[in-house]
Amino acid sequence: PAPAPAPAPAPAPAVDIIIPVYKDLEETQRCIQSVLRYARDNITASRLIVINDASPDSALTHWLRNEAKKQPGFLLLENEDNLGFVGTVNRGMTQSATNDVLLLNSDTEVANQWLDRLHAAAYRGANVGTVTPFSNNATICSYPRFCQENSLPPNYDTATLDALFAATHPGASIEIPTGVGFCMYIRRDCLQQIGLFDAESFGKGYGEENDFC
């Protein structure tokens, strides 16, 4: 008899995009709107989880609530007390037992097929646990000047520059000593093995992703 066909590989998990929010309405709007705008350009299944970390800004809270009502796939959580970055993203990462997670600072902007590229890099090998992209201002992931803020060139916006860089070395990835929490993709199997961020040791934040990696 003919050999049985090989089973199809299991589909990769969907992704929870987790954005902790505390202040700065304009930056938060740009971040969330960029995620929503480019969702249609990415085939990776995703859910947006925005967590208001007890913001004192009533205008920000009002905008988030209105936006969550209008947008499908937008889950808004509100902390009763300020938990800081670590406690807040830990809450986000427990909203699913199976989805991968992507931590995104509220002062970032994304563009084009950003999520598909991060997802592809995460599943390039079984030994990959986290993925962090380059950015114009992200310490060891700053590009082209390492550990410096790189202003956008004149007449370039985020999407235009992203498309240029994506075409320069398409699909390329390198190993780095640690992920950086401004935009950090974490595979669920990695999260299950390591556990959540260490809120007891790192309190309100800074250094928790280095400890995790």
Task: Locate the predicted segments by residue.
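A conserved hydrophobic helix/loop-capping motif in glycosyltransferases and polysaccharide synthases
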Residues: 15-27, 31, 38-39, 51, ...
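Cell-envelope/extracellular polymer assembly enzymes that use nucleotide-activated donors
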Residues: 14-16, 47, 211
